[in-house]
Amino acid sequence: MGDVPSPLWLRTTDVDHMRRDGRDEDPGHAWTSERIGALYPGASCSLLDCGVMSGVTYAGLRDAGLPVDYTGIDVSPRVLDACRAEHPGARWLEMSVTDLAFGEGTFDVVNSRHLLECLPYYETAVREMFRVARTHVVIGFFQVPRAPEALLRRETDEGYIWLNRYDPGPFEELLHRLSREVETADLRHGPRRSRIYLCTKR
């Protein structure tokens, strides 16, 4: 996001709130760790995590014993400070997914979870993730794509926040144009549904 995060944005990216909200326990984290482990058995891989939340992806990869060279990015200094304090062994950088300061094919895997819903739209971010990925892109949604598309920009006195639901048709068409294979997993955690796309880059 090109805008400076508003106070509302900072509150809604609060690390403790994410844990209370149950996002840390979502089965998508374990699914992603298992698939990455299967794709790179016994080998190290480099991974860029876009929108790090509470650092849960890094923790899941570490707890699974995967030798991942991890870099996490987020637009929120508050989130990054919390991640640095809790996980000093990883790299945490302030950066927007729509303007990644890395060269083409820098990372074996590029991952994002519950990030694209919070952007004004997804295409720039998706193309940037594919640009810097060498082999795989993983995209997870808590706001599962379905028609009709709903682009929700919630205005407040303190700024705004997006919570979009995308039409799966155009979104998945973009993924297939950029990928030679797209694997989809639909998961459930209590009442919450999530969807993960695991893309193998062309």
Q: Language model features by range: what are they?
A:
Residues 111:
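A conserved beta-strand element that flanks and buttresses the S-adenosyl-L-methionine
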Residues 54-99:
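Class I SAM-dependent methyltransferase SAM/SAH-binding core
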Residues 114-118:
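Short catalytic micro-motifs in class I SAM-dependent methyltransferases
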Residues 1-41, 44-53:
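Conserved class I S-adenosyl-L-methionine
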Residues 161-179:
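Short alpha-helix
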Residues 119-128:
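A short, conserved alpha-helix within the catalytic core of class I
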Residues 134-143:
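Conserved beta-strand signature within the Rossmann-like core of class I S-adenosyl-L-methionine
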